[in-house]
Swiss-Prot record:
Native source species: Picosynechococcus sp. (strain ATCC 27264 / PCC 7002 / PR-6) (Agmenellum quadruplicatum)
Name of the protein described by the UniProt record: tRNA pseudouridine synthase A
Role summary: Formation of pseudouridine at positions 38, 39 and 40 in the anticodon stem and loop of transfer RNAs.
Cited InterPro entries: PsdUridine_synth_cat_dom_sf, PsdUridine_synth_TruA, PsdUridine_synth_TruA_a/b_dom, PsdUridine_synth_TruA_C, TruA/RsuA/RluB/E/F_N
GO molecular function, one term: RNA binding
Isomerase as UniProt keyword: yes
Reaction equations catalysed: uridine(38/39/40) in tRNA = pseudouridine(38/39/40) in tRNA
Active-site residues (renumbered): 60
PANTHER family in the cross-refs: PSEUDOURIDYLATE SYNTHASE (PTHR11142), TRNA PSEUDOURIDINE SYNTHASE-LIKE 1 (PTHR11142:SF0)
Residues the entry annotates as binding substrate: 118
Alphabetized Pfam families for the sequence: PseudoU_synth_1
Gene3D superfamilies (UniProt xref): Pseudouridine synthase I, catalytic domain, C-terminal subdomain, Pseudouridine synthase I, catalytic domain, N-terminal subdomain
Length: 274
């Protein structure tokens, strides 16, 4: 979606990876290290202007992203595709720009998105692994039945009012979510829970996973689970799964801006197949 060459102000889209361990989330906060603030400061240094970037989603403190999208505007002669290398040469090692391109003025990282997909990773091997520890919840206390977890996920497909899975402090005016995919799979010692929806409530996936683990080990029945979310019994949703297991996997748009190897297959192989 190229912009007119007569307009010196450009809108640039970015595909961003980050390791969330040492960030207080995506959104800029006073006196805190956040992904948005670090990228904004880096771009501002390059162009000599104060820059604001807009992300497709706001990940919480400690949550990772394999394919976050964002955009910013600036007055610069730098071609859109060159921004990836320019920023990667200046950004800290826990942020990586996988791709950049120029887009039209009506393209918006948040409002043009049709869906977001999150993956939660649980590592069930009894022995801790330092190379996996930062990116997965090490849960080995009891066996987890992925078929029970999938049975709990399937009824969530479609549009539902999921206020039971919304943390306090949310600024959303409603809790309606259109869940397009909800899948649980096991690969070796890993259990992956993936949720795709048009949008997500504050803390939704981690609250949901906390209950799914209880279902997977037989502590909570499928009937009890459905009663909780269908009747919005938020007071019974007491545990939020650790942030480190959650990753914003990818974001979908009507027209892909980048080839699949840039925005789609972006998580480390060992988290997919081990």
């Amino acid at each position: 979606m190229p912009m007119s060459q007569a307009n010196p102000r450009k809108r640039i889209a970015l595909v961003i990876q980050y390791i969330g361990t040492h960030f207080c989330g995506w959104q800029r906060q006073t006196a805190e290290r956040t992904v948005q603030a670090v990228i904004e400061e880096t771009i501002s240094t390059v162009v000599g202007q104060k820059i604001t970037i807009h992300g497709a989603g706001r990940t919480d403190s400690g949550v990772h992203a394999a394919g976050q999208f964002a955009h910013f505007e600036c007055e610069s002669l730098i071609p859109g595709y060159k921004w990836a290398k320019i920023l990667n040469d200046r950004l800290p090692p826990d942020i990586n720009i996988r791709g950049a391109c120029e887009v039209s003025q009506d393209w918006h990282a948040q409002f043009s998105a049709q869906w977001r997909r999150y993956r939660y990773t649980i590592y069930t091997h009894p022995t801790p692994n330092l190379f996996i520890q930062p990116y997965a919840w090490h849960y080995y206390q009891a066996p987890l039945d992925e078929t029970l977890i999938q049975a709990a996920l399937t009824p969530l497909l479609g549009e539902h009012h999921l206020a039971a899975f919304q943390r306090t402090g949310s600024k959303r005016s409603h809790a309606w979510v259109n869940v397009q995919a909800a899948e649980c799979s096991r690969r070796g010692s890993f259990i992956h829970i993936e949720i795709q929806a048009n949008g997500f409530l504050y803390g939704m996936v981690r609250l949901l996973v906390g209950m799914l683990v209880d279902i997977g080990q037989g502590k909570l029945s499928l009937a009890q689970f459905q009663d909780i979310w269908k009747n919005e019994k938020r007071h019974l949703v007491k545990y939020s799964a650790p942030a480190k297991g959650l990753c914003l996997l990818r974001v979908g748009y009507p027209e892909p801006l980048f080839p699949p190897h840039i925005w789609f297959d972006t998580q480390p192989t060992f988290l997919l197949t081990h």
